[in-house]
Amino acid sequence: MKSEIIESLKSKLNRRVWESWFGTFDVKEIGPDYVVFQVGNLFIREWLEKKYGSLISKTLRELFGKPMDFRIEHASAKTEEKLDSNEDEPLVKKRPLILTPLNPILTFENFVVGPNNMFAYSTCLEVAKNPGKYNPLFLHGGVGLGKTHLLQAIGHYLFKHEPDMRVIYLTSERFLNELVDSIKKNRVQEFRDKFRNKIDVLLLDDVQFLIGKTGIQTELFHTFNELYNEGKQIVVCSDRDPQQLEKFQDRLVSRFQMGVVTKIEKPDEETCFKIAQKMAQLENAELQEDILKLISKNFSDNLRRLRGALVKLIMYQQISGEKVDLQKAFELLAIQNSYHNKSLPEEKLMNSICEIFGVSQEEILSKSRKKEVALARQIGMYVARNYMGFSLRKVADMFKRSHPTVSHTIQKLEELTNSGNMVIKSQIDRLARCVTGQILDQSV
């Protein structure tokens, strides 16, 4: 019956979740009306009880045909110490110790590499493949640019490829809370032993949280020294460069700078578009390419905001049963409401085209192929479609052109802007700024 329980649970979970959280999960005992499970440590036990308790209960009821009680036990510290000290026993593999849950999506495979993060990505991958080679690694950059993704990716890689290596991933807030808790319970030595003697890799996120907290900085300093002197890998993430960590002990800042310091920059529009594509793919969502471009143009400053925008559109599609078009995306994401103003946005666009390019509305709507007229018309179509959210049919009607002509024109301008034609890009931006009140194309 043990194997049936395991297989039934496994079939209800995706592979990443199973490997991340159920790697040490096993059936210890089956009674007449209860089942006892065992996992590797307390944190995993608490996480499984909280997140998957109802699923476990439902699975047991299905298999036994009646309600079953269950409890999850974890290997005690004493048991682990006994196993470690018993030389006659076969070697017991030490699974990575994950204090804060790893997001199963945040792997190297799912990280989109661009010019802004190439060095950071390559360094983190090298650290994962060869722990201790670049030590310490200090990764910094603005909020929502992928630091945590890379940090957790290291954890996932080690969990998969180095099962004997003891890895701790946690936030600096968690590190502080653990210390405070150990002080309250008079177990500071246990805390120190855990972080200095029982791990091989420390992955510490959001170290800027410790700014101004002298006591915990001192503890981190000594922990850092112990790990470093033993050749154990340390990776630290922050939203700022080590030198910008105000109210941080100088000796600790100097430790951060001993190894490799690398920064993640803001992604360019092309990388943002690829990120939006990857996120949509991971969510199994179908969104038009122009919608993904809209999101990448307007949320490139913070990838968490970008994902939030994407999820909002996906949820709308799921709840309403309707496919989101470009104009609906503008509305749902509240991007520059001014061009959804009821006071004839078409008229505002046409007037702006005439004013900026020095042509008349009659020329724009005519069959004239004069270079200056054709260019003004084409840029007007592009802005109407990509910046104002008009449908292709609406753009075709407005400029008195066929649907295929409009589609071809927009594709042609897209190719020109992607190839780096700054003249065209600046003209598009000027018109877009005039009709929307903001510059949406940040790459200009």
From Swiss-Prot:
Cellular localisation: Cytoplasm
Pfam families, per the entry: Bac_DnaA, Bac_DnaA_C, DnaA_N
InterPro entries documented for this protein: AAA+_ATPase (IPR003593), Chromosome_initiator_DnaA (IPR001957), Chromosome_initiator_DnaA-like (IPR020591), DnaA_C (IPR013159), DnaA_dom (IPR013317), DnaA_N_dom (IPR024633), DnaA_N_sf (IPR038454), P-loop_NTPase (IPR027417)
A GO term, aspect molecular function: lipid binding
GO cellular component: cytoplasm; plasma membrane
Domain I, interacts with DnaA modulators as annotated region, ranges: 1-66
Region (Domain IV, binds dsDNA): 318-444
Domain of life: Bacteria
Start and end residues of each stretch annotated as Domain II: 66-100
Residues annotated to bind ATP: 144, 146-148
This protein's UniProt keywords: ATP-binding, Cytoplasm, DNA replication, DNA-binding, Lipid-binding, Nucleotide-binding
Record-level GO BP terms: DNA replication initiation; regulation of DNA replication
Principal location: cytoplasm
Location of region: Domain III, AAA+ region: 101-317
PANTHER family in alphabetical order: CHROMOSOMAL REPLICATION INITIATOR PROTEIN DNAA
Family: Belongs to the DnaA family.
Domain notes: Domain I is involved in oligomerization and binding regulators, domain II is flexibile and of varying length in different bacteria, domain III forms the AAA+ region, while domain IV binds dsDNA.
NCBIfam families linked: DnaA
Subunit (UniProt): Oligomerizes as a right-handed, spiral filament on DNA at oriC.
Function: Plays an essential role in the initiation and regulation of chromosomal replication. ATP-DnaA binds to the origin of replication (oriC) to initiate formation of the DNA replication initiation complex once per cell cycle. Binds the DnaA box (a 9 base pair repeat at the origin) and separates the double-stranded (ds)DNA. Forms a right-handed helical filament on oriC DNA; dsDNA binds to the exterior of the filament while single-stranded (ss)DNA is stabiized in the filament's interior.
Name listed for the protein in its UniProt record: Chromosomal replication initiator protein DnaA
Lineage of the species this protein comes from: Bacteria, Thermotogati, Thermotogota, Thermotogae, Thermotogales
